[in-house]
Amino acid sequence: MGFTSLHLAKRTGRLAALALLAASLTGCQVISGSPQYTLARVIDATPDVPAPGGLDVYQNSTVSLYNIGFGTASSYIPVTPGSLSYSIDIAGTRQQLANVGGTFALGAQYTVLIGNVTANLRMTVLKDQSIPAPTGQVAFRFLDQSTRTGLVDIYLLPLGSTLTAASPILSGIGFDNAPSYIDVPSGTYSIVVVPTGTVPGSGTSPLYSGSQIDYASGAARTIVLIDQPLVTTPSLKVIPADDYDSPVATN
């Protein structure tokens, strides 16, 4: 569930093609829902920030991150629980582009998502899963922040399977979808994304076809679809974003 965001940017412009991002984390990679902490991270999914191209992120008017770029995801950072506000400026300036506020609960984890093109820039606060998926399951959340492609279907292909024998885990996903977690059996999967309605084996190339990755029991992952600049043919990449890992599990 996202909190209210404000659209403050005035610049137009779009970049072509598509990439799939799920931001990798450093530092707090194993999160076990310790109640004494509230954790927040920032993901930048906006493709056309004005020059010089980076963003400074402020929390309650105090700088939190400097000069982050498109496709960046921070590690989880401890924050004081309660009402917090976040804003973004063009790096090195105090030209604010957008802001958002919300209540951050004790013991919870959040993603501050920066999305859309600059002309309609917005920030959204999402509550992340901070508890394990059911035993034998892994939780996936897909966020579509791609502004240049239409609706997509998303597949999780088990090891040794083919797209022609699979059914999509999600169909008709579009920009700024309302995200929720989906539990699937833990195991080894490849993420494949195709335009909605694509018939497997019809000759249409996937927008993305990832390598096989092992997902351990109890894990939770967020995958963000973003525009990829300077590419004439739509393409995708995937980087895993770790919302939760069991303290005893390994990938």
Range-by-range predicted roles:
Residues 17-22:
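Hydrophobic helical h-region of N-terminal Sec-dependent signal peptides
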